[in-house]
Structure formats: structure tokens, C-alpha cells
Amino acid sequence: MSAQELPTRAKIVVIGGGVGGTSVAYHLAQLGQRDVILLERAELTSGSTFHSAGLVGQLRADPTLTKMNMYSVELYRELEKSETPASWRECGSIKIASSNERMAEIRRQIGWAKTFGLDLVEISNDQIKELFPLINLDSVVGGCYLATDGQVDPSQLTQAMAAGARRGGVKIFTHTRVLAINTKNNRITSVTTDK
């Protein structure tokens, strides 16, 4: 997409073409913002996004993070239906306990999950073995399972969100290094690039 000419003005400039930057650009487009450019110094996903495992566990100790991860699962399901799927695999997740104290904590998490409408269920060792046959259960006392957790390919997710952002009017420029973020009166006024 860098073959197009870099505009001299834009209302919003997103710096970075990893999963974070493309997500911001995608959501800005979803909110109706049309004067948006994204600048990436190399290729999309060429930074830390490439190294991520892409595991998506929804339940967190922080309610905001739990809601954000639940939203992410819904977004990934929607992206799977788009022209550029994100390679979302809703394979579920297992947490195991190797002590009675840890099992008590898992039971508390099951209650916490219910407050968000997440169907986190307690499972026996036999059920753990059925879900993950390679596990050694010698020190396992039990666990829990959340069927709607999963894994997404971070590179595919980035490409899917970039495609959605482009469809919404965002212009993406790769091989464009940001050299400076310029300010005046404590406000960002412009960015300087190598182009």
C-alpha cells in the first residue's frame, strides 16, 4: 500500500503496524473516522507481533481486561466471516491444580467467571485427560475448562484488521519511518517521516 503518495496532512496518525496499531486503525474506521493514516517502518507484523503465541484467555483478575478479552473473542469470530479471516481457533483452555489450595482458587475463578457470563466449568482428571491426552496427571487434583478461549494467528489477525481498516478508508504506509513527533504548546502538531 506504500505505492500511494504519503499525504501531507491527516487528522489522525497511527504509528506502528503491528496488532496494536492495526487494531487502533480498524476501530477508528469502525467509528467512522476517515482521515486516518497508519505508518509502519517495515512491513506489517514485522515487530513483536510476529513473536506472539496469540493465546486468548478471557478470564482475568481485572474486570476491564476480562471484558476486553471477551470483546476480542467476538471480534475474532466476526473477522473469520470477513474477506480476510484472522485464523481464530476456538479450542478452549484448561487450567489445572496441583494442590487443594490451587483447586480452591480455581473454584473461586469459576464463580468470578459467572459474573461475566463465561461458562468456566470444573473438570475432573478424567475430563482433563480426555481434552489433553498427553498430560501426566500424577500431581493433578483437578482443573477447569473454558470452551470459548482459543488461539489466533497474530500475523493473520494483523492483516485482517489492516484489511478492515483499509475498507473503512484508512491509508496504510509501510517502509515509512517516523523520525519525530512534533509538539507545540504541549500538543502534537505533526510527525516527521523519512519520506
Segments predicted by a language model, with ranges:
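Short, flexible hinge/linker loops that cap or flank conserved catalytic cores
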Residues: 4-7, 30, 88
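Beta1/beta-strand and adjacent pyrophosphate-binding region of the FAD-binding site
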Residues: 6-20, 37
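Gly/Ala-rich phosphate-binding loop of Rossmann-like dinucleotide-binding domains
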Residues: 25, 29, 164-166
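Glycine-rich FAD pyrophosphate-binding loop
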Residues: 29-49
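Short loop/edge segments at beta-strand edges and connector loops
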Residues: 40, 124-125, 174-176
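Dinucleotide-binding Rossmann-like beta1-alpha1 core, especially the glycine-rich loop
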Residues: 53-131
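A short, glycine/Asx- and small/polar-enriched loop/turn
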Residues: 101, 132-140, 182-189
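Helical element adjacent to the flavin cofactor pocket in flavoenzyme catalytic cores
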Residues: 144-195
